[in-house]
């Protein structure tokens, strides 16, 4: 009686061995940024407020990390969030609240696979709210560098 493995032959067995030894997919850190301004809000807001955001996502740990810096707002920031999924010019709900409202804001969160896919597809935005602009004073889509 023949073994199941003898039907593969030597080349087949070598292929299976090499496939089993292949290294796992490499994790990477993906860099994103955002350029927050009033004209990006929906609807647009007249504001002298501006702010860059530097964002990274680690594919191994699923950790999103950010630094959001802003100035020129109509008053103190009252809230800040990541929203999605939404294309530029569209609105969506909060997906990750940003703790702290004093510039610069630094923080992190662990994403689900679905959230990471939305982020990678450019479907997330950040905005910063004030009392004068409760819906958001400055906003920007999060884009890969």
Task: Kindly give the residue locations of the regions a language model identified.
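Bacterial N-terminal signal peptides
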Residues: 11-20
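Metal-centered catalytic cores of metalloenzymes
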Residues: 2-5, 23-80, 84-145
